[in-house]
Amino acid sequence: MNKAFLIRVLAILLTVSLFSSGGCSSGEVAYDKLRERMVRDQIGARGVSDRLVIDAMMKVPRHLFVPPDLRGLAYIDNPLPIGEGQTISQPYIVALMTQSLGLKGGERVFEVGTGSGYQAAVLAEIVDTVFTVEIIPELAERAQALLDTLGYGNVQVRAGDGYEGWPEKAPFDGVIVTAAAPRIPDPLLDQLKVGGRIVIPIEDGYQELQVHEKTAEGLELLFTLPVRFVPMKGKVRDSRTR
């Protein structure tokens, strides 16, 4: 049996257990309780303390951003497949990356790699506007439809290559990249305000999450962490090293 099949079997078993237990009067209440536990045990207990981030993670219904047959696994701390060879990041990493942007509220943030739209939704609970680009058109369309349905009118999704950024909407207070790149794309730095941060997984034999702050002199590295992301596609693969 392959891994994908086992994941789906586990999801079905957990879903049956979840909705047959006597402690929850409805499916949404059950998901609310699982989300509370996720935030407490997987996020808060591991050092994510920014109140804006905690509140955002409590509000966004992660189970709606995964395939229906995987909703029983939505609140465990693991990435999950969302189709097209892509994944939704584990909740802790989403919270950590969001906290690493140093958001205060009211910002304009650019995201590379919309995927399911979950990271964009978390950001949208905090900032003024999220601009997000997805290289796979089917995912971009699906994410925009879901975000619209959930009332996230402050998220704009575009299908395209995130390497180029979104110059018409720049400059940005923060940039977040949800796929591993061999280097930081120049256009993303050009479109980032001085004082803003970029959070990006970099692959160079292995992957590490890097958090940089843009200064008048260049970039200041603030933080690194070993991670594992799907690779960033498109022009970044043949771009020159900065």
Residue ranges and their predicted role:
Residues F65-I82, T87:
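Short, surface-exposed glycine/acidic/tryptophan-bearing loops
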Residues G102-L219:
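Conserved nucleotide-cofactor-binding alpha/beta core module
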Residues R40, D77, I88-E107:
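Conserved alpha-helix/loop element of class I SAM-dependent methyltransferases that forms part
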Residues D41-R46, A56, V60-H63, S100, ...:
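Structured segments of extracytoplasmic/periplasmic soluble domains
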Residues E203-R242:
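Active-site capping/gating segments
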Residues V9-S21:
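Bacterial N-terminal signal peptides
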